[in-house]
Amino acid sequence: MGKFKINGGKRLYGEVEVHGAKNSILPILAATILNEGVSVIHNCPRLKDVDSMIEILEHIGCKVSFSGRDIVVDARDVKDSEIPDNLMRTMRSSIFLMGALIARNKKAFISFPGGCDIGHRPIDLHLKGLKKLGVEIEESYGYIRCKGVRVRGNEIHLDLPSVGATENIMLAATLADGITVIRNAAKEPEIEDLQNFLNSMGARITGAGTNTIVIEGVKKLHDTEYTIIPDRIVAGTYLCAAAMTRGELTVVKALKEHLEPLISKLKETGCELKTGNDYIKITCNKRPKAVDMIVTLPYPGFPTDLQPQIVSVLSIAEGTSIVTETIFDNRFKYTEELVRMGADIKVEGRVAVIRGVDKITGAKVLAKDLRGGVALVIAGLGAEGTTVVEGAEHIDRGYESLEKALKSVGADIVRIM
């Protein structure tokens, strides 16, 4: 297990660039197998989860090359429809291959996926939606066997606006007979990115970014070249790191329209933020103020994936803040580690009460998941003394060379084994 060693108290200053969106590249990589040809994808992040998805694609018969920021997927020889358990367990996003394999090979055999342990994340919505398209599904002993001899369009109303279920249904319906309508669809920018990628291959999809998505099935897709959007969660993480260190940071390739809830809350803490077409500049010259309330919600609400980072900032804010987590039921585990650093945080179910302290101090802490782990790095940047964050492999799932990016803007951080 790798670790990050951080000597805190260094003000972040300068310019940092955001890499491509993790939550776009993973479903888009799954989507490449719908095209019996070659797909070229630009602005790809080098992440542990991306490596895992590439390994799965290669296992089922794809030829994949990753050079610089570009991934080329040749999916002409996709034959296998079974993904081994050891590959499925590496990340939750492997579930996207289910819808894609059904569309391409009319069948899929997978185990339940892995990923961060941040609470109950059932795939019932995925399976329910696929069944509405005519897919036969058999579950036994942790495995899922799908058969979709003739996938037909249908109207599907999601019980919850699940990102994963929305994307899996989109993938399965792209080559289906007839028209599929997804109601109460998730609205995240990454879903719109997936729509745009599929349409660049010849799919006929409209409505992504709204609560109703319409997919008109087509017979065949063609080769494409596509650039994915910047990662809004990485951009938000850098903004929180600047707020934690009372820094001045320009985050390049950050789209303000994807980050309005965070920008609003950071302004409430007293930070100054200026935005342009592809950047956000944050200036924080004093101790942050508490915010009355943050409630995580599906997009365009405050993102659950930025909840841990903002809590780190609020741990040293002046006053008391209340944060309510409505998406995942076990996402406050990291607060135990913040308390080890001197934070005053009380968690009751889905609600955290954060009483800001004058300072937190360095400690040895453990990253238990991706976003909670990076929140501990942020805390270490603003802490007095040295912090060691164990479990760097969790953070590597969503951040490319995090220590290099932070070091480039003044952080004293190194990776150690």
Curated annotation (Swiss-Prot):
Q: Which residues bind phosphoenolpyruvate?
A: 22-23
Q: Which SUPFAM superfamilies match?
A: EPT/RTPC-like
Primary localisation category: cytoplasm
Catalysed reactions, as listed in the record: phosphoenolpyruvate + UDP-N-acetyl-alpha-D-glucosamine = UDP-N-acetyl-3-O-(1-carboxyvinyl)-alpha-D-glucosamine + phosphate
Tell me, what is an example of a GO biological process annotation in this record?
cell wall organization
Keyword Cell cycle carried by entry: yes
Briefly state the protein's biological role.
Answer: Cell wall formation. Adds enolpyruvyl to UDP-N-acetylglucosamine.
Query: Do you know which HAMAP family this protein is assigned to?
Result: MurA
Q: What does the sequence similarity comment in the record state about its family?
A: Belongs to the EPSP synthase family. MurA subfamily.
According to UniProt, the name of this protein is UDP-N-acetylglucosamine 1-carboxyvinyltransferase 2
Instruction: State the taxonomy lineage.
Output: Bacteria, Bacillati, Bacillota, Clostridia, Thermoanaerobacterales
